[in-house]
């Protein structure tokens, strides 16, 4: 059995409890790692791998990082999905008997990191927990440790839908049970979410106040999340707020796939924010406001009174230009109050953080004054509700210097005059050299020795040096010999000894006292955290509403009107993002009118004509309106929409083994199963991923089902011109087309939506724009003429047909067996649109087994 040194035994004992984390083991000024941790960390962090003697026959692998720069290394590991356990020395090495006591003081995980570049200002950093409630429902909770925000909700769907929802919210780490981890594991990597297992739950006696507003079924996720936070952070976190319950009926629900298709927060192309609705709407000037805007985008409102309340504030801000500009000027001076409050509670706040808190709170009276003086009741109500936190400002103004350093260890954080003893120590430390110089001059005058000097070294401290030729001039009764040199003697006096102790200890004692005073101030601030958080919430909402007002003015947006019916009327509507991207080019506006008895629209027209843009435009106007923002239209009279479903331009989900057509069918199934008459449904070219007749049949049957069974406001684009005939059979269906024309043999897209069906597809013209070879285009024109002449078969090939590359699987002459015909009948009876993906797979498996058994 290998015998290690006591220190290494201590390391191994600690490591046993943190097997899934890198253990940063404090040794002096370094955090050291050993064994596998050292090997792996040296590769990931690109630091030198060395070794050390640990009492065994062979040296063990070791690497380390300086404690003062450890944050950067920790952040790198956490960003890559690893966990880091911080093991500190918990006693003074000078007082230790044997091995210095050490213990883990924090476990930093992907969801709990509290500082560094990972915490991007305008984005939340959420950690979540989920629990499977039944076969189709998951309860979940999430919180941002850096701000204290905490939310609980639920979602219907499978494990992939849950993870897509978590990914949409930006959740970095999801706490699950062992069984749920198995269910989610295959999708977690694609979603870039770390799954962490936690079996324990915080007891209700500790957590009751956190979950009062949460339904009992969802509380288990909250309790498990709190237990994990408590276990990893190992400190009181007074800034974590009570969980709010997001009851879905109060919000416009948009599934993660539709959010992606509409490019609300991330663009489909680059995955960044440019070209998204968030990019357009974000004129916020605070980090808090940026995060709040993103939250509102994720969950627009679905309660008319709440929407109209926001719109009323935006209207008043638009009418008060000078108030608006003064408010934004003041808000630009406000730092991230939510995260500053979080750092106070967490205990990692610095002097500069407290200065930022003080300077931010100093802006609140000016903000309040502007709101109260605006002459608008809505703005005055906001102003009255603001807490200026005067007592916090007074404490920080009295205690903290104007420009403190980043870390408390550098000193000069506490203001002079705040504490008498600290002032004395600082005076001694700052003026020690002056006192020494003055004493030296006094001793020269007393003794008459012109070359008498006072010096200092680390061994003997301060001393008075007199050359041997002048010793007879000194009053040796006042001097005590300290050191003898070849040509001089060194002495000390009682006064010098006392001053030496004061000078040498003053700086060290000053820093220690300053740190203790800083901790007292930090702890005193904890009782103000709820007030600062409430203020931050008000300021963040004001920032977003100011952003809505400035954007609405800049882009000539219009105030939407809401009613309790289902009709949707948008006059001269525009796609806000496309319009901005076009810069000075003219954007062609379009109407969209869906009446109560005519609320399905079938859109035809050539590729590149703007069908998809038109459909997205309608959805974005609904989203913006229900966020409480003005919209890009001359007029918008809208119903309250409960859900938006989109099937527009999905990319192949190859990683999940799903083709474009399969994704199309799954998303269509989800929409049809969950939509209500109050929903908005957008379908772009359904059925294009399969054969013409299959696709056309699916598209028609879906339109009929939505028309007859659901009744939702629906936009349905297609290349199947045959479907336009359905206008005669479906009373609520109207045909429209995106106009195009020919000029000099070239297609010109007018981007104008007009009533009626398109009379031409212009597919070959689009191919010409793409500069396909003329030989191909010419042949296509010939084939098109044949098809349009009514030929039912493919035009005769110009070359002799080659034998098929693949033999047919079936011969037409072979009759179908009765048992096979029975399987076909069963297949025909399956309601595909009313079947979940898992049920469909089971049915398919059963039918396949029946066919295979026939051949045995």
Curated annotation (Swiss-Prot):
Q: Which InterPro entries match?
A: DNA_mismatch_repair_MutS, DNA_mismatch_repair_MutS-lik_N, DNA_mismatch_repair_MutS/MSH, DNA_mismatch_repair_MutS_C, DNA_mismatch_repair_MutS_clamp, DNA_mismatch_repair_MutS_core, DNA_mismatch_repair_MutS_N, DNA_mismatch_repair_MutS_sf
Q: Ion transport as a keyword?
A: no
User: What GO molecular function annotations does the UniProt record carry, in alphabetical order?
Assistant: ATP binding; ATP-dependent DNA damage sensor activity; damaged DNA binding; mismatched DNA binding
Keywords attached to this Swiss-Prot or TrEMBL record, sorted alphabetically, are:
ATP-binding, DNA damage, DNA repair, DNA-binding, Nucleotide-binding
Q: Name one GO cellular component term.
A: cytosol
- One matching Pfam family is MutS_IV
What domain of life does the UniProt record list for this protein's source? Bacteria
A biological process (GO) of this protein is: mismatch repair
Tell me the residue numbers annotated for binding ATP: 605-612
Similarity comment: Belongs to the DNA mismatch repair MutS family.
Annotated function: This protein is involved in the repair of mismatches in DNA. It is possible that it carries out the mismatch recognition step. This protein has a weak ATPase activity.
Q: What is this protein called?
A: DNA mismatch repair protein MutS
**Which lineage ranks, top first, belong to the organism behind this chain?**
Bacteria, Bacillati, Bacillota, Bacilli, Bacillales
């Amino acid at each position: 059995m290998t015998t290690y040194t006591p220190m290494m035994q201590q390391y191994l004992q600690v490591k046993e409890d943190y097997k899934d984390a890198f253990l940063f083991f404090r040794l002096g000024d370094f955090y050291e790692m050993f064994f596998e941790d050292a090997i792996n960390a040296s590769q990931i962090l690109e630091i030198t791998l060395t070794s050390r003697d640990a009492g065994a026959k062979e040296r063990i692998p070791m690497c380390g990082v300086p404690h003062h720069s450890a944050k950067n290394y920790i952040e790198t590991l956490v960003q890559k999905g690893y966990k880091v356990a911080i093991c500190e020395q918990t006693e003074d090495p000078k007082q230790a008997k044997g091995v210095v006591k050490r213990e883990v003081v924090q476990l930093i995980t992907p969801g709990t990191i509290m500082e560094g570049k990972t915490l991007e200002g305008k984005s939340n950093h959420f950690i979540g927990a989920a629990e499977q409630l039944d076969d189709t429902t998951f309860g979940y909770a999430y919180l941002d440790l850096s701000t204290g925000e905490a939310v609980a909700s639920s979602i219907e769907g499978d494990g992939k839908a849950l993870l897509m929802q978590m990914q949409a919210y930006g959740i970095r780490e999801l706490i699950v049970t062992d069984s749920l981890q198995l269910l989610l594991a295959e999708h977690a990597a694609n979603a870039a979410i770390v799954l962490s297992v936690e079996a324990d739950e915080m007891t209700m006696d500790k957590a009751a106040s956190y979950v009062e507003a949460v339904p009992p079924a969802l509380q288990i996720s909250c309790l498990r999340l709190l237990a994990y936070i408590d276990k990893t952070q190992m400190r009181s976190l007074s800034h974590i707020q009570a969980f709010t319950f997001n009851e879905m009926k109060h919000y416009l629900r948009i599934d993660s796939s539709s959010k992606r298709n509409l490019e609300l927060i991330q663009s489909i192309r680059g995955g960044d924010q440019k070209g998204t609705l968030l990019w357009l709407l974000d004129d916020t000037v605070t980090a808090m406001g940026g995060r709040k805007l993103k939250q509102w985008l994720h969950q627009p409102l679905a309660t008319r009174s709440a929407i109209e309340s926001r719109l009323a504030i935006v209207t008043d801000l638009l009418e008060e230009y000078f108030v608006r500009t003064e408010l934004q000027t003041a808000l630009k001076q406000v730092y991230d109050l939510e995260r500053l409050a979080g750092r106070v509670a967490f205990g990692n706040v610095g002097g500069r953080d407290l200065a930022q808190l003080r300077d931010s709170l100093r802006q609140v009276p000016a903000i309040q004054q502007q709101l109260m003086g605006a002459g608008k009741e809505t703005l005055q109500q906001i102003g009255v509700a603001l807490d200026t936190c005067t007592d916090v400002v007074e404490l920080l103004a009295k205690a903290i210097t104007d420009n403190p350093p980043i870390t408390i260890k550098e000193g000069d954080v506490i203001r002079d005059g705040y504490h008498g003893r600290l002032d004395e120590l600082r005076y001694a430390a700052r003026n020690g050299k002056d006192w020494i110089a003055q004493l030296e001059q006094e001793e020269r005058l007393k003794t008459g020795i012109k070359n008498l000097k006072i010096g200092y070294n680390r061994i003997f401290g301060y001393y008075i040096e007199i050359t041997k030729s002048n010793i007879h001039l000194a009053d040796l009764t006042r001097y005590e010999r300290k050191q003898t040199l070849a040509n001089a003697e060194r002495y000390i006096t009682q006064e010098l000894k006392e001053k030496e102790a004061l000078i040498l200890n003053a700086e060290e004692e000053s820093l220690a006292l300053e740190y203790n005073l800083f901790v007292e101030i930090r702890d005193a601030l904890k009782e103000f955290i709820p007030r600062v958080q409430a203020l931050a919430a008000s300021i963040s909402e004001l920032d977003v509403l100011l952003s809505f007002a400035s954007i609405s003015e800049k882009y000539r947006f219009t105030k939407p009107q809401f009613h309790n019916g289902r009709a949707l009327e948008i006059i001269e509507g525009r796609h806000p993002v496309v319009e901005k991207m076009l810069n000075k080019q003219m954007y062609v506006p379009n109407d969209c009118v869906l009446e109560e008895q005519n609320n399905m629209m079938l859109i035809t027209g050539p590729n590149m004509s703007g069908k998809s843009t038109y459909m997205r435009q309608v959805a974005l106007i609904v989203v913006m309106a229900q966020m409480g923002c003005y919209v890009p239209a001359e007029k918008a009279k809208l119903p309250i929409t409960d859900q938006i479903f989109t099937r527009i331009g999905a990319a192949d989900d190859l990683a999940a083994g799903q083709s474009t057509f399969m994704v199309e069918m799954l998303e269509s199934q989800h929409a049809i199963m969950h939509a209500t008459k109050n929903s908005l449904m957008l379908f772009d070219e359904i059925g294009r991923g399969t054969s013409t007749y299959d696709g056309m049949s699916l598209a028609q049957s879906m339109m009929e089902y939505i028309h007859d069974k659901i009744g939702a406001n629906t936009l349905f684009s297609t290349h199947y011109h045959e479907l336009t005939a359905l206008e005669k059979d479906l009373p609520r269906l109207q045909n429209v087309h995106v106009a195009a024309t020919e000029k000099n043999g070239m297609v010109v897209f007018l981007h104008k939506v007009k009533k009626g069906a398109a009379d031409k597809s212009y597919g070959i013209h689009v191919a010409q724009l793409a500069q396909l070879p003329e030989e191909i285009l010419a042949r296509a024109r010939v084939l098109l003429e044949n098809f349009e002449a009514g030929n039912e078969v493919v035009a005769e090939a110009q070359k002799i047909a080659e034998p098929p590359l693949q033999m047919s699987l079936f011969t037409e002459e072979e009759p179908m067996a009765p048992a096979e015909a029975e399987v076909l009948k069963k297949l025909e009876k399956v309601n595909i649109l009313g079947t979940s993906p898992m049920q469909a797979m089971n049915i398919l498996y059963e039918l396949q087994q029946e066919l295979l058994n026939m051949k045995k």
